[in-house]
Amino acid sequence: MATTEHRPTERVLDILELLSNSESGMTLTELSKALEAPKSSIMPLVHTMRSRNFIYMQSETLRYFIGVATYTVGISYNNHQTSLQFIKQEMEKISSICDETCQLGIQSRNMILYIAKVESSQPIRLISSVGKQLPLYCTSLGRALLAYKSDDEIRNMFPSTLKSYTSNTVTNIDSLLKELVATRERGYAMEREETNHLINCIAVSLNYHNNPIAAISVSIPTFRLNEQKIQETVNVLFEAKRNIESHFKTFGVDFGNLD
């Protein structure tokens, strides 16, 4: 493995990463091979890590595994940073970069429930409130979640005729299904003035174990919307999605208080 900093420290971290990704553990020989380092240089590190309970050795097989001290450190981090707090930090970044309002929503039956938002500093921006609910079918947040459902599931969720909120609202199931096909192909959902006049939204789902559990969106007034703005926003959302889903994978999902 390539080294860029203090070599012994890097090897300690490399050992932790290797063992954390190995359900069957690793022998000293396997660690030596993976690290491209002699056993003589690894053994002192392993001995210290064992004595501090960051790793342990199974005496019958001589294989090393992640130890309880590693769990203690990890749970300490998780206790101080819930999933929602981490998402909120990413939303702050999104709003700062895009200078637009960013919202987080979860599914509540056939509605999207807004559970967090970060306001834009722009004088003209979307005005919304946490706790508000809107139909899944006409919001980008909702469509980002609906895209993971089958056509039959969608048809069973909604009536054939859908309520209109503006002249742009999708008002029938077939049109909604076409929009969801486009959402799957793009990797993000879009809504153009379907719930609010002159407001457009772009959203991506946040997945845990390959299931969408929430979605984040950016709301953009029509007069600030163009193809460049869309692409820049999508790129920022994709980066946040990767960061958040990586957090989910490492720490699980804990939608605790945002305070």
Where are these regions (language model features)?
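Extended hydrophobic
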Residues: 168-243, 258
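N-terminal helix-turn-helix
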Residues: 1-78, 85, 245
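Short amphipathic alpha-helical signal-transduction/dimerization elements
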Residues: 20, 142, 146, 150, ...
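Amphipathic alpha-helical regulatory segments at dimerization interfaces
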Residues: 18, 34, 86-97, 186, ...
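Short, highly charged C-terminal tails/helix-capping segments
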Residues: 250-259
